[in-house]
């Protein structure tokens, strides 16, 4: 596919000229190419590939290219996010116990699972790094009234939303700090720390975990959730010149996808207590539910897009960007029945 043809494909997708099933098939083609690129003939080669990336990350800054993250993803209108997500406004995977589980139920089930695996108990001090719209902090603070939750976000809109929800829910045990995690410093020490889908935009996990360990009490625990591939780890960069998919959502340099085992190579300042993996089917289904929510409310969705863009064409492109985002996530995490790309949970203690 020549550059001109790739640009035309993306333009037609964003204008809604390509059917969903065709887009999904194009995504699956790119996913298969990624696996062909990543899987090696011998275990020796496979391990060498992983360790090469581990060693290179240890020589990098904590995070790079953060300023290039697409604002469409991280500064989306609150009215839109309320349409897309469930009642807990969880911007990551839900936990689906069976086929009848709703999006709201899946959000609650996953948040309950976080609390259980992080061993949250009343009276603890809890830090939520990269707290997003506060799903973890708000849920935890409502369930554990004697805990004090501190959320850290770099988004003014997210901070305002969480503080508004605290007033609505009459929660006095949540505070939100506006800060960049890579430069954030505090003298406070916490019983528990959450890092849910934070490391994906980091590079040097060694520096990150060292920094986090300094905020942990001696008997504190760190709970991490991150998306992963079961074997492969790689920077999110195109496989070849024809790859339209890789940098469509995440610009080059802004995302590194870890393997399920990758953080085990970064135990200088923390040591793993436990690890779990969750089938990619959970995240795939969350993306499908988000897409359904958008399509069920398409008229309202279009009006929101029109309110933040200058032209009708830009509104259509933004609408289809979000639809394609959901299809990309659904296909990635659903690929091969959720047994390639998935989620992992890790619990660390301080060394």
Curated annotation (Swiss-Prot):
Active site per UniProt: 326
Enzyme Commission (EC) number: 2.1.1.140
Example of a GO cellular component annotation carried by this entry: cytoplasm
Tissue-level expression: Expressed in roots, stems, flower buds and at lower levels, in leaves. Restricted to sieve elements of the phloem adjacent or proximal to laticifers.
Location in the cell: Cytoplasm
Induction or repression: Up-regulated upon fungal elicitor treatment or wounding.
Reaction catalysis annotation: (S)-coclaurine + S-adenosyl-L-methionine = (S)-N-methylcoclaurine + S-adenosyl-L-homocysteine + H(+)
Annotated positions binding S-adenosyl-L-methionine: 91-92, 126-134, 153-158
Gene Ontology biological process terms from the UniProt entry: (S)-reticuline biosynthetic process; methylation; response to molecule of fungal origin; response to wounding
Pathway: Alkaloid biosynthesis; (S)-reticuline biosynthesis; (S)-reticuline from (S)-norcoclaurine: step 2/4
Group of enzyme by EC: transferase
Protein role: Involved in the biosynthesis of benzylisoquinoline alkaloids. N-methyltransferase methylating (S)-coclaurine. 4'-O-methylcoclaurine and norlaudanine can also be used as substrates.
Similarity comment: family membership: Belongs to the CFA/CMAS family.
Descriptive protein name: (S)-coclaurine N-methyltransferase
Gene behind the chain: CNMT
